[in-house]
Amino acid sequence: MNHERILEKRETILQYCHRLTEMHRAALFDEEESPRNLSLQQLRKNIHICLKDLCRLNTWLTEQDGGFRKALGSLERYESKLAALLAKERQLGEERQAWEAAVPAGAGDDSGGVFTVHGGHQRHLNAYIESMGVDNTGLGKEPDALPRLSRQQALGHVAVLRLAQAAVSREISQAEGLLKSFRKDQTFIKAELAKLEAFVRAQKLAVERELEGVRRSQEHIFRKIGLLKLPAREREPLGLGRRPAADLESMKAQMEEFLHVRKSALKAMLSEHKQETQLLKSQQEVWKEVTTLVEDLEDRIRTRFATAAKVDPVELRRLITDAITQIKSLHYEESYPDVLTCIRDEIAALEKANDQLPFSKQKSITDKLVPVNTGAGFLVNSTSPPKVGLTKSIVPSSSMATNKKSV
């Protein structure tokens, strides 16, 4: 059972004890309001049971594996878990930031990839144009015009053009092979880029999911320690990739102070209830002694009336006075208010009973005394005296003695 449940039960018992105190007073002084279903002796016993139960609950709260120490241990464990979660959150935040980093410097520098193509056919072509003249070639105003050439000139130009044609064909073939290689490289680069970009997205998503799990764990602990009151289903969900709620961030800022206050409060309650346990044990003993003294008095009065035809009121006064003196000698001043009230009510009831006893200095007191009858009245007519053991249940039907004791 956790300390909150124990404290709730303790509060219930305290309220019941207060109600018993009121019933105890009514049973002692108020005949009309006296509880019908509980005797005075049972009320006294129930008050003692309440004190015993309170003592037991306090022991559960303060023992080595009790409620307060368990709560303190839980808070310390939660504090440790939260510290680990916050460290994990910082680490994941840094990791996410690293995945968002720009392309490293120099990655776009392509100066080392310059290709220089040398056109060997240009030499032959330039020689031909220079020999023929630009205007006498297809570059002139009349592309189809052909100057008068000697056989040697014509064959020479043909030879040069054939060399140029062979050279340019070779160079085109080389260029086409290079372009094909470039296109092949392009296809490979696209495939590799798509694969690696998918990998980066997956890694970033994994970091986000892990961050989400960390935040949910934090929220769970905040709810456990009482910093977050609303149940999870009533809170806005923290979706993947979304920023945490503002109140969750606020709770992180309050966490250290909140835990410090909670632990300080639990330690203070632990110390307070440990002291209270000793007080409760002492009060159990005091109340037990009080009820024992009162019930012993009742038994002695009952026995005296059962064994003597007449009883001197002076003897009764002495018995009651002795009981009052013994009760007052007990250390009960620091008792619970309800226990203190019950003890004082017992004393007041005894004193009232003592005051209502006639004095034996008179010549005869039998005229002022009546036999105990079937009613619940006290030994003096027309009174509703306290129930201190001098009612019909204790005193048999007999008369009080005169000045002279009759044994």
Curated annotation (Swiss-Prot):
Subcellular location: Cytoplasm; Membrane
Recorded GO CC terms: cytoplasm; membrane
Keywords of this entry: Autophagy, Coiled coil, Cytoplasm, Membrane, Protein transport, Transport
Biological process terms in GO annotation: autophagy; protein transport
UniProt membrane topology term: Peripheral membrane protein
Keyword Coiled coil: yes
Coiled-coil segments on the chain, per record: 74-101
Domain of life: Eukaryota
Homology family: Belongs to the ATG23 family.
Role according to the record: Required for cytoplasm to vacuole transport (Cvt) vesicle formation and efficient autophagy. Plays a role in ATG protein retrieval from the pre-autophagosomal structure (PAS) and is especially required for autophagy-dependent cycling of ATG9. Also plays a role in regulation of filamentous growth.
Protein name: Autophagy-related protein 23
UniProt source species: Eremothecium gossypii (strain ATCC 10895 / CBS 109.51 / FGSC 9923 / NRRL Y-1056)
